[in-house]
UniProtKB/Swiss-Prot annotation:
MF annotations from Gene Ontology: NAD binding; NADH:ubiquinone reductase (non-electrogenic) activity; quinone binding
Domain of life (superkingdom): Bacteria
Protein name: NADH-quinone oxidoreductase subunit D
UniProt cross-references to Pfam families, sorted A to Z: Complex1_49kDa
Gene: nuoD
GO cellular component term, pick one: plasma membrane
NCBIfam families for this protein: NuoD (TIGR01962), PRK06075.1 (NF004739)
PROSITE patterns: COMPLEX1_49K
Amino acid sequence: MAEYKNYTLNFGPVHPAAHGVLRLILELDGETVVRADPHVGLLHRGTEKLAEFKPYNQSIGYMDRLDYVSMMCNEHAYVMAIEKLLELEVPERAQYIRVMFAEMTRILNHLLWVAACGIDLGAMTVFLYAFRVREDLFDCYEAVSGARMHAAYFRPGGVARDLPTQMPQYKQTRFTSKRKTKKINANRQGSMLDFLDSFVVDFDKSLDEIDTLLTDNRLWKQRTVDIGVVTAERAVELGFTGPMLRGSGVAWDLRKSQPYEVYDKLDFDIPVGANGDCYDRYLVRMAEMRESNKLIKQCVDWLRANQGPVLSDNHKVAPPKRNAMKNNMEELIHHFKLFSEGYCTPEGEVYVGTEHPKGEFGVYIKSDGANKPYRLKMKAPGFTHISAMDELLSGHMLADTPAIISTIDVVFGDVDR
């Protein structure tokens, strides 16, 4: 009888460690991965083509649903591309608000990443710790937009509205005592800026808890050290960006190398790894959360000291004030025309790249002068990273596959688009 040495295994698309709908066809020699063939496209929704049939301002909601755990960072690149096309000035206060929410989104993304990675590798407790913190940031999303995830808060020319002067509070239920309700509402008595002042102090302590659980944990290091190694030279050749690139020791960050918004006015460092393995990518993301926390604090201090408009006064892209719209027919017509027909942009093409939590997220728009893009193309960091799956997995044990997939931090909303 013939002896079969290699065999093929389907990993996903419904495997809990596939992080979405990834289908991997693994060729195994015993328990060693010989070849990995990633199949993508199972979450394709035609976002780029949909946006080409909508006015520019009606596609912001689509951006939230690309990488659906880094919502406002997707919006950020899209509205900046429209602003570049229109040569539109954004008020400074709006820029600080955008940067603050972009860094909140980075923390949201990395907390979900460390929680999911922990579960993949058998560390359940970190999931509970991370989600406890994420709730506070989702409350900030809800306070400015009314939605806890798909906010559509960034607009061409600024943001939809200024920061609220009152944070939402928990209500007492039959499951919580009056004393406990008062305790959890203690930091919600003032404005959002007051709440964030309290958050940045508490968040450092929360990161210390996760550090204690994982960083020097012997089992965690056994599952991540020297697993999925990518050298700095190879990471550049493969087109890696974000933590995947910085984990290999390359200090490339668009917020520093090609500053946008007000990042050139803020003080922060770029964490880098040394060995390019799963453990280094974990350390980089943990350090990035601390840097994002510092950036949020700097934005809060500036916003507290400086008032001003949060949306451009260019009436071509900015809707009228709501109270004016309810009292004057001209403003009502303006509002209706703006949100039904949108606005035309000059002919031309632009590309804007931002430092997304997963890497460089880019938006390319080609305009023919109409009120909708002639062509919209998005550069998703996850697509580039997942293209290197064969190289990352080959030679490793089957049990290392979830660790490597997890540290890539892939979400198929933006990979498949």
